[in-house]
C-alpha cells in the first residue's frame, strides 16, 4: 500500500480514506494506534442534523444486533461527537461471495451456507424484522455471519410473520444476484429449510 493512503488523525491512522459512501456518511478504514485494531470511521457527508439523527439510530440498532447475537459490531460516537467508530469485521460480504461463487446455494455442506442458515434462524427467532438487510450488509468472518449495517428494526408479534417477511425479502433480494434457474431453485430450497 502506498503512503499516500496513510493519514494521521488523533488516535488512529487512516488506512483507506473515503472508501465507501452512503446517504448519511462517508466511510474510512482506520487503525487504532493503541492496539493496531482496525475500525470503521463514519463521518457525516454534511452538517445536516439528519445525519446525526441517523447516527444515533445506528448506535441503537447495533445494540439490538448484539443483543440477539446477529453481530459483534459495536458502534459508538468518536471523541468529536459528530462521527462514529464501528467494529471492523474482516471477511467477505454476501455480495462478494455470490459474485465469486454462483453455485453458493447449491453447496449445502459448506460452512458459510450452514452458518447463513443458523443466522436466518436467529433473525426469525428474534421476532424483529430488520429493514434493508441487503447482501452488502452481511459479512461472513469465517465462522459466523454479521450484520454490519441496516435500516430500521421493527418488532413483530409473531414468529410466523417475521419468517414470512424475511423469506419473501431474502428471495426477492438474493435471487437478483443469481444467474440460473438452477441456482434460484437451490436458493428456494435453502430458504424453505431455514425459514421455518
Q: What would you call each of these model-derived segments?
A:
Residues 133-140:
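Hydrophobic residue at the +6 position relative to the catalytic HRD Asp in the kinase catalytic loop
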Amino acid at each position: 500500500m502506498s503512503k499516500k493512503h496513510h493519514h494521521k488523525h488523533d488516535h488512529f491512522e487512516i488506512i483507506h480514506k473515503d472508501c465507501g459512501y452512503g446517504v448519511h456518511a462517508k466511510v474510512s478504514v482506520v487503525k487504532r494506534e493503541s492496539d493496531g485494531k482496525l475500525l470503521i470511521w463514519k463521518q457525516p457527508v454534511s452538517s445536516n442534523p439528519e445525519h446525526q439523527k441517523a447516527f444515533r439510530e445506528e448506535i441503537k440498532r447495533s445494540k439490538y444486533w448484539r443483543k440477539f447475537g446477529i453481530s459483534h459490531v459495536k458502534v459508538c460516537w468518536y471523541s468529536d461527537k459528530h462521527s462514529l467508530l464501528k467494529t471492523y469485521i474482516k471477511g467477505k460480504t454476501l455480495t462478494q461471495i455470490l459474485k465469486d461463487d454462483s453455485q453458493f446455494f447449491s453447496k449445502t455442506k459448506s460452512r458459510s451456507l450452514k452458518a447463513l442458515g443458523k443466522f436466518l434462524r436467529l433473525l426469525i427467532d428474534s421476532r424483529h424484522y430488520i429493514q434493508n438487510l441487503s447482501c452488502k450488509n452481511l459479512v461472513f468472518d469465517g465462522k459466523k455471519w454479521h450484520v454490519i449495517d441496516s435500516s430500521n428494526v421493527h418488532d413483530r408479534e409473531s414468529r410466523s410473520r417475521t419468517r414470512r417477511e424475511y423469506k419473501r425479502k431474502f428471495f426477492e433480494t438474493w435471487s437478483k444476484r443469481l444467474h440460473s434457474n438452477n441456482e434460484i431453485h437451490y436458493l428456494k430450497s435453502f430458504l424453505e429449510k431455514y425459514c421455518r
